[in-house]
Amino acid sequence: MAKRFCVTGTCIPEKNYMVDISGRIDRITKDYIEQGQYFTINRARQYGKTTTLFLLERKLREEYLVLSLSFEAADEYFQSLSTLAEGLILDIGECLREQKVEEKLIEEWCSPISEKFPMRSLGQKITSLCRSCGKKIVLMIDEVDKSSDNQIFLSFLGLLREKYLKCQQGKDDTFQSVILAGVYDVKTLKLKLHPQEESKYNSPWNIAVDFYMDMSFSAKDIQGMLQ
């Protein structure tokens, strides 16, 4: 099948003309994933975020279990903490099946969560999966800013932050790396810790490192694509 240009979605190397970004993927893997970093890829649309995640996932699957999600059509997840937890369990369950994870682990992951404490229950599932699957796990979420103004989403970031900090202290097991991709930098979002006191805020994503990667293309890059 002849290759064609794609400007409307994910670029597939086997199907589309595209700049070779394998060097960029290698640098992300070495400088961020292997170092256990949590980070955000925030760039304007048409900058290749989704394609970068796709190609990064393909590379990482050689050594990691990759949970690749998108909040593109997940508005209904953000009605409550319970709906978010249930939605994530469904989506991650699909990732586990697609990557041929042991059926026993999938059944455990998909078991019912606590109705009263859905986020705590989700956190326990993450711990159990990370301890049992035999591979380090990378979580990727594209279009993450679709619900970035939602308190429910911020609570989920708070859960990831709590587990990351406990893991650093040797008290928990959690994802090797978390990548959030979107137009805006969710690192700047604020979680109100004390509703009765307007002045007290804290960032739920202050564990994230800055992502220093030029995602633009040079004339030489583009020339290589056309040759």
Task: Label the predicted regions.
Residues 55-58, 62, 162-165:
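Short, well-ordered alpha-helices that flank and scaffold nucleotide-derived cofactor binding pockets
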Residues 9-12, 148-227:
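The catalytic "switch" region of P-loop NTPases
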Residues 26, 54, 86, 154-158, ...:
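Surface-exposed alpha-helical interface segments used for non-catalytic interactions
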Residues 1-45, 49-59, 128-129:
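Walker A/P-loop-proximal flanking segment of P-loop NTPase domains
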